[in-house]
């Protein structure tokens, strides 16, 4: 029983790979995407079994982790979004306690980012989602630490987030939705 860190197929020669950050490889082919179906032998990100290229272990010996006995698959499956949220919010951002945070995307990565921002001392934590998130995901976001939820389907996201946070106290914007419009809005609200 193992789990991959989803380094996928990294080149090993670009600047990111040379620094050991294989997730940022310029030529990386990720696991479970339609455009690389054949690269991984038809394995997707949510299949029970996936073929991981052995070459990644020569580059990154810790690309595959053994799941300890007693840890269920369901528990192990959340390690990826938790680790990614932790790396983004706690290790790579310059968030200072007392600043505000905006998180785009109400999936596991976004929800874990909210939790970590709360632990790190963020004051206003704004979760941005869509109409379908109002009943299902927004209550969870509030439960794990979001102070405000903004419905991008009905509200001017940039205006509303800046009303809540103010441009000067907005310390971090995290984009977890994958939507182009969210990336554009993220950049608009930054100093």
Where are the regions a protein language model picked out?
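Hydrophobic beta-strand signal
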Residues: 2-4, 102
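N-terminal Rossmann-like NAD(P) cofactor-binding module of classical short-chain dehydrogenase/reductase
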Residues: 3, 171-174
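Conserved amphipathic alpha-helix within the SDR
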Residues: 157-167
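Mid-domain Rossmann-like dinucleotide-binding core that forms the NAD(H)/NADP(H) cofactor-binding site
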Residues: 48, 69-155, 159, 172
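NAD(P)H dinucleotide-binding glycine-rich loop of Rossmann-like/cofactor-binding domains
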Residues: 11-104
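Helix-to-beta-strand junctions that scaffold the AdoMet/dcAdoMet cofactor pocket
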Residues: 190-191
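Beta-loop-alpha module in the N-terminal Rossmann-like domain of NAD(P)-dependent dehydrogenases
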Residues: 176-185
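Glycine-rich, N-terminal phosphate-binding loop of Rossmann-like dinucleotide-binding domains
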Residues: 6, 153, 177
């Amino acid at each position: 029983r193992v789990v991959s860190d989803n380094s996928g197929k990294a080149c090993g020669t670009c600047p990111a790979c040379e620094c050991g950050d294989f997730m940022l490889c310029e030529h990386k082919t990720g696991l479970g995407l339609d455009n690389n179906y054949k690269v991984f032998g038809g394995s997707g990100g949510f299949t029970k079994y996936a073929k991981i290229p052995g070459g990644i272990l020569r580059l990154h010996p810790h690309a595959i982790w053994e799941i300890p006995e007693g840890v269920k698959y369901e528990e192990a499956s959340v390690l990826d979004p938790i680790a990614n949220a932790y790396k983004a919010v706690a290790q790579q951002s310059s968030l200072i306690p007392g600043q505000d945070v905006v998180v785009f995307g109400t999936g596991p990565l976004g929800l874990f980012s909210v939790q970590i921002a709360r632990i790190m001392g963020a004051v206003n934590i704004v979760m941005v989602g869509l109409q379908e998130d109002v009943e299902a995901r927004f209550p969870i976001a509030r439960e794990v630490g979001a102070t405000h939820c903004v419905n991008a389907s009905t509200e001017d996201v940039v205006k509303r987030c800046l009303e809540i946070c103010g441009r000067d106290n907005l310390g971090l914007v995290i984009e977890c939705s994958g939507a182009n419009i969210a990336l554009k809005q993220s950049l608009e609200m930054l100093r």
